[in-house]
């Protein structure tokens, strides 16, 4: 796959609908905002969280970093999938604003889109955001992106962070 620019509905069709369900080992997602996105599966719309729960059922390790607590509809969908409670690894970091999806350490999307229906292009043409990003399998891009994700995950910046009082998931207590 060549590194390429993707935008709007392409983010949904190529990343959310096609590549994420093909994840085999690990899926890392970082987003500032997260909402109860619905996606097409076998001709019907289902919560994206169902897709994540199914991946976990296949042994995929999933890490999610987000910047704020999701709303009630997301929490209700989350509660429907018990695997998520036990196996979805999650960190809330109020300073996160980068958005990325890293699939098996070999494919990555990074760009402007939050993990929401409007952001990822899952909503209808006149309701989705104008978003863009890069889809790549280039190690020279994936490695620093993975390092940024992992540094937030392991709390590399927590010691000197000025927002620890707003951070319920700080990995260093």
Predicted feature locations:
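An N-terminal domain-start capping segment
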Residues: 1-21
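Short, flexible loop segments at the rims of nucleotide/cofactor-binding pockets, characterized by
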Residues: 3-8, 39-42, 85-88
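Short His-Asn-centered micro-motif
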Residues: 7-9, 29-31, 65-68, 91-94, ...
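Short solvent-exposed loop/turn micro-motifs enriched in small/polar/acidic residues
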Residues: 13, 91-95, 127
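Primarily the HKD phosphodiesterase
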Residues: 19-84
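Short, electropositive alpha-helical surface patch
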Residues: 77-87, 163-172
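Short beta-strand scaffold segments in enzyme catalytic cores
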Residues: 99-102, 134
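Signature of lipid phosphatidyltransferase scaffolds
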Residues: 107-173
